[in-house]
Amino acid sequence: MAIVKTVKAPEQFLVEVNGGYDIMFEEVEVTVAGALPSGTVLADAATAATGIEAAVIGILADDKPAGTATVRVMTKGNPSKVRAASLSTSTAAIVGALEALDIFAV
């Protein structure tokens, strides 16, 4: 008998991609101790953004379990639009930092 596992669809924060689905996801070893949901903005591999950062590395594309884990991170858009309300933080500073990566929060 087959086992069916329900999984959450990744990248629920995406609104629109320019053309095809050519998003720059990179595998990053994230060392934040706690679990983080998809859509968390990362200041760096060890820190979730708090809203005041001038630069970020990207947005988690997958849920990250507790402890160190290698996960997909959206590090650059093509350009791409993301849903600001679905991100962990969407202050003006974070929106500006994401725009520098061609990721536009709407």
Name these PLM-found stretches:
Residues 1-106:
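Surface-exposed, low-hydrophobicity beta-strand/loop segments enriched in small/polar/acidic residues
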